[in-house]
Every structure is written in structure tokens, then in C-alpha cells.
Amino acid sequence: MENKLSFEEAISQLEHLVSKLEQGDVPLEEAISYFKEGMELSKLCDEKLKDVQEQMAVILGEDGELKPFTALGDEA
């Protein structure tokens, strides 16, 4: 799975695969292929969400409050 997909692109592709599978007229081998691709997309989305969650934790700090921005060298 190409990691260059944005979260939105990956979700869109995942929704498309789910829609195809929900129709129920997909041959078994193709359904398995869609399922595998969907699992990869799901994993990619999960990784991207975890990355954002980590970034938000850094921005907000442990107490959930916004930290004041300090530029490099302004810590004096």
C-alpha cells in the first residue's frame, strides 16, 4: 500500500471497496483481494490517526491545555 496517500484518499478508497463488497456480487477471489486491500488501507488510516494524536499530545501537553509557542532561541 502506498503510504503517500492522504488520510482522506485512503478513507475514500476504503469506502469504495466496502461498497463493492456490500453489493454481494463480487467473485470470491476478487472479494478476498478487496478485503486484503481494505485491511492495508485501514492500517494506513490507523497509523495516520495515531501520528496526529501524538502531534496533538505534544501541542496540548499532558494537562490538555495549549502550550505557549516558543521559537527556537526564545527560551530565555
From Swiss-Prot:
Alphabetical UniProt keywords: Cytoplasm, Exonuclease, Hydrolase, Nuclease
Protein name as it appears in the record: Exodeoxyribonuclease 7 small subunit
Main location: cytoplasm
Pfam families named among the record's database cross-references: Exonuc_VII_S (PF02609)
Homology family: Belongs to the XseB family.
Gene Ontology annotations for the cellular component aspect, listed alphabetically: cytosol; exodeoxyribonuclease VII complex
The protein's Enzyme Commission number: 3.1.11.6
Catalysed reactions, semicolon-separated: Exonucleolytic cleavage in either 5'- to 3'- or 3'- to 5'-direction to yield nucleoside 5'-phosphates
Function: Bidirectionally degrades single-stranded DNA into large acid-insoluble oligonucleotides, which are then degraded further into small acid-soluble oligonucleotides.
An example Gene Ontology biological process: DNA catabolic process
Any one GO molecular function term: exodeoxyribonuclease VII activity
Assembly information from the UniProt record: Heterooligomer composed of large and small subunits.
Compartmental location: Cytoplasm
Species: Bacillus mycoides (strain KBAB4) (Bacillus weihenstephanensis)
Segments forming a coiled coil: none
